[in-house]
Amino acid sequence: MNLDLTPLAWRLAGTPLAAWANDVQQQLDAKLAIGHGDLPRWRRAVDALPTLMPTQIELRECFRLAAPCDEATRQATREALMGLSPWRKGPFEVFGVHVDTEWRSDWKWARVAPHLDLAGKRILDVGCGNGYYMWRMLGAGADSVVGVDPNWLFFCQFHAMKRYLPELPAWHLPFALEELPPKLEGFETVFSMGVLYHRRSPVDHLLDLKDCLVRGGELVLETLVVEGDENTALVPEDRYAQMRNVWFLPSVPALERWLRRAGFVDVRCVDVSVTSVEEQRSTYWMRYQSLPDFLDPQDHGRTVEGLPAPMRAVLLARKP
């Protein structure tokens, strides 16, 4: 795994992010020194991937890497990638190996991407997971993408793909949003997808996202919502769809109000979709329980706790 962030500093030179980018290597090295118990095993899995040069790279319509290779090489690729399971976001097609992830993240991207112009943009993806969407952002023409997510497995899954795309301007940092400097004000587009409902203080999260944006920059916010008016927000008594760390599920009108209160303008909802058991499910690459296990077996409109089943909205907003 190549963890040299010098290319990131070069890429962001001359931007409002230059000073931060020059210091971020030190921050990464400090986190790596603390590490994680499984990190050596996951790094070995990445290093076990065959040395191949992609002859075809597709990021716009899907994530696909292709190159001539024999069955033994394909099997080695499969085994190395399986060493990084569970795979949650994807799918990835890597030299003929189909990584069928828990989420059909390509479906979400198909709902989000038509509403965005990412050409030439400096992007921050907060809670980026394994970086699937980061690659798709590059496919949509982004200038550079920085993703932050403190999960070390996701970090290694990203580097499994980065191994074959070393020159592309995407960087995954194993940080929480709170570990970035305050008032960065240097990204032209900031994504927060699947994060807000995990935050105990959702409006503070919106303010933190705004602080990462340049003036005129765009926020892309995707989160769980419920039906209701501008005063509606569901706070689960305990779990929601078996997740413990779910705090606020607002209605779309309430979320629009939160965004305006946080100082955003041009707030609009561009998509609302009920999550189906075809979009999120267990697979060979993610063998734990998934959405079908979290819904009422008699009524897929309800969770096992009797709450409204997952429904997700995508909202866009601009920093004035």
Curated annotation (Swiss-Prot):
NCBIfam families: PRK15068.1, tRNA 5-methoxyuridine(34)/uridine 5-oxyacetic acid(34) synthase CmoB. It comes from the Bacteria. One of its GO terms (molecular function) is transferase activity, transferring alkyl or aryl (other than methyl) groups. SUPFAM superfamilies: S-adenosyl-L-methionine-dependent methyltransferases. One of its GO terms (biological process) is tRNA wobble uridine modification. This is tRNA U34 carboxymethyltransferase. It comes from Stutzerimonas stutzeri (strain A1501). Pfam families: Methyltransf_9 (PF08003). It catalyses: carboxy-S-adenosyl-L-methionine + 5-hydroxyuridine(34) in tRNA = 5-carboxymethoxyuridine(34) in tRNA + S-adenosyl-L-homocysteine + H(+). Its EC number is 2.5.1.-. Catalyzes carboxymethyl transfer from carboxy-S-adenosyl-L-methionine (Cx-SAM) to 5-hydroxyuridine (ho5U) to form 5-carboxymethoxyuridine (cmo5U) at position 34 in tRNAs. Belongs to the class I-like SAM-binding methyltransferase superfamily. CmoB family. It is an enzyme of class 2 (transferase). Carboxy-S-adenosyl-L-methionine binds at K89, W103, K108, G127, L177, E178, M193, Y197, R312. Keywords: Transferase, tRNA processing.
